[in-house]
Structures are given as C-alpha cells and as structure tokens.
Amino acid sequence: MFGSWVPLALFALVVWSIQRVVTKVALIRWSTARFYRLNAVLSLGVYAVFAIAVPPDPGGVVGAVGLSLLMAMTFWVTTEATRRGPVGVVAPLTAMSPALTVILAVAILGERISFEHGFGISAALAGSVLLSFRPRAPQALAGWLPLALASLVLQGLGAFIAKVLVTASGPTDLLVTSAAVQLIVGLIIARGEPLGGRELLQGRGLATAVTLVAAAVATIGYLSALSVGPASAIVPLVATSPALGGLLGILAIHEAVTRRQLAGIALGGFAAVLLATAA
C-alpha cells in the first residue's frame, strides 16, 4: 500500500526531470541570470496563489527565512566548489548529500529503514555518483575540497531542516520565503537582461514558462509530501530525478551517452521504483 506522500513525491520527480531537459534547451538561448529571474517570478506567483488557499503560519516565518538564506548560501558554495575543483570529484561528492539527510532523519526523528528501503537509498546514491562522475577535469584551484564538503553538509542539512519546518508549520512559509529570496537575487544578477515577456507567449518560450509553473506546483507537492512522509525515503527518491532527466535528454534532444551514464540512469530508475513501492 502506497503512503499518502508517494503520489506527491512521484509527481515532483517526474516534473523536475522534465524541467532539467527544458532548462537545458532554454539556456541555449537565454543567460543563466535571466532564466533564474524568470523561474523566481513564476514560482513566487504560483506560491502566492497557494498561500491564499493554505495561509502561512506566522510562527514558522523566522525558520523559513533562515532556511531560505541557508539555501541561497548553499547555492553559492556549490557553485564556487564547482568553479574551483575538479567537477569529476565535486559533483559525485555533493550527490551524496541525501545520505546525510537520511542519517539525520533516522538519528533525530526516529525514522525507520527497512531492508528494501536501505537498498533503494544505496541504489539512488550510487546512481547519482555515476551520473555525476567525470573522469577528466581541469586543474583544480585551492580550497575546493572544504567547499565541496560544505556543500554536501549544507544540502543534506537543508533537506532535513525543511522536513522539520514543513512538518511543524506546513509548506507555505518556506515556499514563499524561498521564492522571495530567489527573486531578490534574480533581480540583482539579471538587472541588465531583457524581460522578454512576448517571447513567453509562444513556442519554446511558452513551453519553458509552462514547465517552470509545473515545477513550482511540483515543489508544493514535494514539501507537502515531506510534511507527512519520511524524509529518509522522500529525499533519496526525488534525488533520482537526474536519472529520469538524463533518459529524457537522450530521447528528446539526442544527447550523447556513455555506459557509465546508462548504468547511473538504470540505478536511479531502479531506486525510484524500490523507494516508492517500499513506502
């Protein structure tokens, strides 16, 4: 019997996987800053509508703001670690962050892991590492390892804190504050970029906008699932989205693929099925 959180988590997994492919195509034409700003604007709009139906909890605002700032810092740390270090080591290392979330959920929240559950988590982590691994990388700059380790800790800790916050106060506080922080950052880094409103009304621009709106809805589903379900299952489950996204990239935009990537995709898909059915 599926837990009540499983459909929400699977919806997030599928939509975020599609978003990865759409993002890849969009960034061929748009700058990262412009895309970041657009995502923030559309997400905040979706979350504002959701907040009307599910009002925020004033008692959870402080924690949500704190986590939103932590998420912004995590983004910078991860980006800087990637810039300085060999991506072939940094990416697989940070892909292990769900393991920390699982450890915290078991140790602090008392969540239990079955054999099937544990096997699914292991497969998800192995798939993430295989998908992230790159055997060749440019010369690393000093200080990348502490940053990569900090990124791992911040990502794993952030997912755990999100579980605690949404369980206590619901998802609305975190949704609105995180999008607001993202919008502020987006307006700053994309201040010289065109708005391109007309471009969003047709063709690929419209497809991108619709996908980002769907991704925002998926985030609502993910945090709603996290508020009622086990973080030790949900976080590793949605962390398999690169596997499905990679498969979609191969099929939809004919990206090149290696045996290592195929193995990672297979492991990720297997992990997603195992984690969902073990719920």
Regions found by a protein language model. Name each.
Residues 42-47, 102-106, 116-133, 260-279:
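Hydrophobic transmembrane alpha-helices of multi-pass small-molecule transport proteins
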Residues 11, 37-38, 93-96, 116-119, ...:
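Hydrophobic core positions of alpha-helical segments in small-molecule transporters
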Residues 1-69, 75-85, 133-147, 180-211, ...:
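Membrane-interface interhelical linkers
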Residues 41-47, 93-107, 181-188, 218-219, ...:
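Alpha-helical transmembrane segments of compact multi-pass small-molecule transporters, enriched
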Residues 78-116:
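Membrane-interface helix-loop-helix junctions at boundaries between adjacent transmembrane segments
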Residues 2, 142-176:
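Selected transmembrane alpha-helices and immediately adjacent juxtamembrane segments
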Residues 32-36, 174-175, 234:
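Juxtamembrane helix-start motifs in multi-pass secondary transporters
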